[in-house]
A protein has these predicted regions:
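A solvent-exposed interaction/effector surface
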Residues: 43, 47-48, 55-59, 63, ...
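N-terminal intrinsically disordered/low-complexity leader segments
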Residues: 1-8, 32, 39-40, 50-53
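A short, Lys/Arg-enriched amphipathic alpha-helix from helix-turn-helix/homeodomain DNA-binding modules
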Residues: 3-29, 59-79
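Short, Lys/Arg-enriched, disordered terminal segments
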Residues: 1-11, 127-134
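Short secondary-structure junction/hinge motifs that connect adjacent elements
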Residues: 30-39, 185-188
C-alpha cells in the first residue's frame, strides 16, 4: 500500500472510531471488538488511533464521557447524578464520582451547584475572545424543528479557531472539485468552549449533501447527521460570537426551558460563513 493510501486508511479508521465513540458513549465500548471490526490487531489499532488523534484511545473515551457529563449536570437539572452517569456510559456511580473529581477537582454535586463557574473562570482568563456571559446576553425563543438524517462529509480538527479558516477553504475546494451544487455548511461542536481548554476542543467542519447517494472517489470521511428534535436559534455575528451563543444555550436557556439535553453534540448550520464564502460575517441557525 502506498504512503498516501496508508494515510487515508488510517484516517478513515480513526475517524470512524471517533464517530462510534460519540454515537455509543452511553454503552460499554469494547476496543477488542472494534479492532476485529476493522480487521486489524488491537496493538495496531491503538497505534493508528494515537497517531491520528494525538491521544490514547482509552483516555479519549474517558475524556468524552466526562465532558458529556459535565454539560448534562448543568442542563438537565431534573436528572439524578446516577442517571447522568449512566447516560455517559458509567455502570458504576462510584467510578464516575472518582473520575469526575479527578478531572474537575470537585464532586458532581458541587459542580451542579455552581462550581462549574469557577472552573470556567480558570479557562477563560487565558482566552482573548471568550468570557462568561450574562443571562440576558441573548433574548429569544427557539423554533423546535425535526432534523432528518443526512450524509455529511467532513474534516475533523482539534482546537476551536486554530485552523478553521484553512479547514473551510479545503472544504470549499472539495465542493468545487466534486461539482456539488446543493449543500449546507455545518459546524459540529463536541465540547463546551468554556468547560474545555480551546486547544483541547474537538470540532467538525462538514458539508451536508442534499442528495442521499454517497459520492465515489472522494478522500473525505462521512457520517450520517443525527436525526431528532432540535431547538433552532438564529444568530449573526463574528466567529467568537457563535461560541457565546453555545454558552448561553447550555448555561441559561436549557436549564430553565423544560427540555433536557442528550449526549448528541450541538451543531451550527451556516447561512453565511466568512471562512467559506468571504461574506465578512457569520449567519447561523
Amino acid at each position: 500500500m502506498h504512503k498516501k493510501e496508508t494515510s487515508l486508511s488510517h484516517s478513515k479508521i480513526a475517524n470512524e472510531m471517533m464517530n462510534y465513540i460519540n454515537t455509543y458513549i452511553d454503552t460499554p465500548i469494547n476496543i477488542d471488538h472494534m479492532a476485529l471490526e476493522f480487521k486489524i490487531s488491537k496493538f495496531h489499532f491503538h497505534r493508528i488511533f494515537k497517531e491520528q488523534m494525538g491521544e490514547n484511545i482509552y483516555e479519549c473515551i474517558q475524556s468524552i464521557r466526562l465532558q458529556k457529563a459535565s454539560n448534562l449536570l448543568i442542563t438537565n437539572q431534573s436528572s439524578t447524578i446516577s442517571k447522568i452517569a449512566s447516560l455517559c456510559g458509567y455502570s458504576s456511580q462510584s467510578s464516575f464520582l472518582r473520575a469526575f473529581k479527578q478531572r474537575f477537582e470537585i464532586t458532581p454535586k458541587q459542580w451542579r451547584q455552581g462550581g462549574y463557574k469557577e472552573y470556567s473562570n480558570k479557562i477563560l482568563k487565558h482566552s482573548n475572545t471568550l468570557s462568561l456571559i450574562e443571562k440576558n446576553y441573548i433574548s429569544q425563543e427557539p423554533k423546535m424543528v425535526n432534523i432528518e438524517k443526512r450524509i455529511c462529509y467532513y474534516i475533523r480538527e482539534k482546537g476551536y479557531g486554530f485552523n478553521s479558516l484553512k479547514t473551510w477553504q479545503k472544504l470549499k475546494a472539495w465542493v468545487y472539485s466534486n461539482n456539488i451544487k446543493e449543500y449546507s455548511l455545518l459546524g459540529i461542536y463536541h465540547d463546551n468552549p468554556i468547560l474545555t481548554k480551546p486547544k483541547d476542543c474537538h470540532y467538525v467542519a462538514a458539508i451536508m449533501l442534499k442528495e442521499e447517494d454517497l459520492l465515489e472517489n472522494t478522500n473525505l470521511p462521512y457520517f450520517n447527521l443525527y436525526s431528532g428534535l432540535c431547538a433552532e436559534f438564529s444568530f449573526e455575528g463574528k466567529y467568537e460570537d457563535i461560541l457565546k451563543l453555545i454558552q448561553w444555550v447550555y448555561h441559561y436557556w436549557l436549564p430553565t426551558s423544560g427540555y433536557e439535553a442528550t449526549t448528541i453534540p450541538s451543531y451550527i448550520k451556516f447561512e453565511k460563513n466568512d471562512y467559506f464564502d468571504n461574506t465578512g460575517t457569520f449567519v447561523v441557525k
